[in-house]
Amino acid sequence: MSNQHTLLISNLLPVGSNISTWWNFGSMLLSCLFLQTTTGFFLAIHYTANINLAFSSVIHITRDVPYGWIMQNTHAISASAFFICIYIHIARGLYYGSYLNKGVWLTGVALLTTLMATAFFGYVLPWGQMSFWAATVITNLLTAIPYLGTSLTTWLWGGFSINDPTLTRFFALHFILPFLIISLSSIHIIMLHNEGSSNPLGTNSDIDKIPFHPYHSYKDLLMFITLMTMLLLTLSFMPNLFNDPENFSKANPLITPQHIKPEWYFLFAYGILRSIPNKLGGALALTMSIIILTTAPFTHTSYTRSMTFRPLAQTLFWTLIATFITITWAATKPIEPPFLLISQTTAILYFSFFIMNPVLGLVENMMMKYN
């Protein structure tokens, strides 16, 4: 098509013809970002960042503001959809070797970190029981940092405990960070288009490319419609599916919930954190659970980019997925046998993937050499 008219070359974005549905989650993430920014703006108009009024203002939004319940529930459910899409997006990157495009991968990890920070600050804003206690537990981890810890925590809290200044600055951060996410997303996309997408085979796509529109744009549209359908079904029939029952009670510093846990999308990191009995060790493991993703491009040893034709690596990858799900499940349970042992085992298995993957790459190289 492009050969027939040279002017079309500059107008069409050439994309590999064999990229599968796993490549559509990037555009779905963009849809989620747009949805979150829009609904977040309308919620911010009616929200009050004050410890005496925050909980009431959320109730006011859902009860009194026209279509406020749609805005509030869409914002909460889209956050979960955002994380489902981003975890699938990362898993695809690990499976198909997309991390070898270093700039794209590293900006992606920066995006994930910023997104997690934004979601954490957002979870505190309704000022419910679980919001308050999750914020207390997580921010308290800063005290584990030698020398600076206590000063940093006091500075973040704006006092000697989580109070009104904390909520005000968390709201300010929750409002400003999405703009950083938008900026990082732009860099992420620019860097991707600098080299181009990989494909399921892990080969160079230059020999077989088709125009992005209409072929891949309609595929993106289909996935967007699927995403919106799932969101609307959840919104209509199960609006509180991802909410914690504790968060329907106003924050009370005098009553501790029986089991403090963050939102489901942080449970894998939280599970790793509490599987280590030492405070500093747990905080380091929590940080490393995200930062370890940055090692992937530098430890790739296999001759082939993708795991499509690497059965040993595939086994390791699906073990990682099972580990991730198990860690998430175990983190919802109290810290007692057998859940503590399950958390510790899965935490070791999670980090083992990033050590074993390069080792398996070398083993597979040797097997190919001698066959």
Curated annotation (Swiss-Prot):
A GO molecular-function descriptor: ubiquinol-cytochrome-c reductase activity
Residues where a ubiquinone binds: 193
Cofactor: heme b
One GO CC term, this protein: mitochondrial inner membrane
Localisation per UniProt entry: Mitochondrion inner membrane
Residues annotated as transmembrane: 25-45, 69-90, 105-125, 170-190, 218-238, 280-300, 312-332, 339-358
Alphabetic keyword roster: Electron transport, Heme, Iron, Membrane, Metal-binding, Mitochondrion, Mitochondrion inner membrane, Respiratory chain, Transmembrane, Transmembrane helix, Transport, Ubiquinone
Main location per the UniProt record: mitochondrion
Subunit-level organization: The cytochrome bc1 complex contains 3 respiratory subunits (MT-CYB, CYC1 and UQCRFS1), 2 core proteins (UQCRC1 and UQCRC2) and probably 6 low-molecular weight proteins.
Protein's UniProt name: Cytochrome b
Gene giving rise to this polypeptide: MT-CYB
